[in-house]
UniProtKB/Swiss-Prot annotation:
Post-translational modification: Glycosylated.
Organism whose genome encodes this protein: Physeter macrocephalus (Sperm whale)
Top-level lineage group: Eukaryota
PANTHER family: APOLIPOPROTEIN, APOLIPOPROTEIN A-I
GO molecular function: amyloid-beta binding; apolipoprotein A-I receptor binding; chemorepellent activity; cholesterol binding; cholesterol transfer activity; enzyme binding; heat shock protein binding; high-density lipoprotein particle binding
Native organism taxonomy: Eukaryota, Metazoa, Chordata, Craniata, Vertebrata
Keyword Chaperone: no
Protein name: Apolipoprotein A-I
GO biological process: adrenal gland development; amyloid-beta formation; blood vessel endothelial cell migration; cellular response to lipoprotein particle stimulus; cholesterol biosynthetic process; cholesterol efflux; cholesterol homeostasis; cholesterol import
Length: 265
């Protein structure tokens, strides 16, 4: 029930911004969540990709071509792992600098979010209470019908369905009414939050210096990140060359073997 309430609040309030309202007692920063997501995503692609390569090599065509793709894939994985290890400190420094430079702005925004959260919480609690009451009423109405089904024969299934349909429609309509009420109650706070955020960015824009400073620092950090990443990327290029050459030789050998078989027929 709590998950349902929070989901509806997100849908009818401020979208992704509202997620901050309920992310309490979470020591992980937003930057850490982004980095963790990227790591999980890359690892998932790596693992699924290896599975596809293994399935292809196990197939009749894969055995016939004998491209040794799995060996090359493992070499690629090892190369990428080394590069990621080399880039780890560099990217960590970039995220730390960016987090430090935007600390003041994020604190102001979090303060605004917390204020709005305190104002809308009573409406969310009231919505939760009403929804629980509606579910309890629905369960009480449906319970006797379930007993009829257990005691009756198959022909009563249609009768049960006919009885359940209006109850379900009533439940749906009442739920929609509660959701609409919640939407109307939260609308002013949604507008207030958007206005607060717009004001924050407008102050930055009008100040000129602060906004330009953020842009300059971000550009400087990205440039530094690129310079520090060059050695690791060069190592990646050098590591890929033998793998690509091996793959090229395997493909040419497979083509040559296939041509010989065709000519021999």
């Amino acid at each position: 029930m709590k998950a349902l309430v929070l989901t509806l609040a997100v849908l009818f309030f401020t979208g992704s911004q509202a997620q901050h309202f309920w992310q309490q007692d979470d020591p992980q920063s937003s930057w850490d969540r982004v980095k963790d997501f990227a790591t999980v995503y890359v690892d998932a692609i790596k693992d699924s990709g290896r599975d596809y390569v293994a399935q292809f090599e196990a197939s009749a065509l894969g055995k016939q071509l004998n491209l040794k793709l799995l060996d090359n894939w493992d070499s690629l994985t090892s190369t990428f792992a080394k590069v990621r290890e080399q880039l780890g400190p560099v990217t960590q420094e970039f995220w730390d600098n960016l987090e430090k430079e935007t600390e003041s702005l994020r604190q102001e925004m979090n303060k605004d979010l917390e204020e709005v959260k305190q104002k809308v919480q009573p409406y969310l609690d009231e919505f939760k209470r009403k929804w629980q009451e509606e579910l309890q009423i629905y369960r009480q109405k449906v319970a006797p019908l379930g007993e009829e089904l257990r005691e009756g024969a198959r022909q009563k299934v249609q009768e049960l369905q006919d009885k359940l349909t209006p109850l379900a429609e009533e439940m749906r309509d009442r739920a929609r009414a509660h959701v609409e009420t919640l939407r109307q109650q939260l609308a002013p706070y949604s507008d207030d939050l958007r206005q607060r955020m717009a004001t924050r960015f407008e102050v930055l824009k009008e100040g000129g210096g602060s906004l330009a400073e953020y842009h300059a620092k971000a550009s400087e950090q990205l440039k530094a990140l690129g310079e520090k990443a060059k050695p690791a990327l060069e190592d990646l290029r050098q590591g890929l060359l033998p793998v690509l050459e091996s793959l090229k030789v395997s493909i040419l050998a497979a083509i040559d073997e296939a041509s010989k078989k065709l000519n021999a027929q």
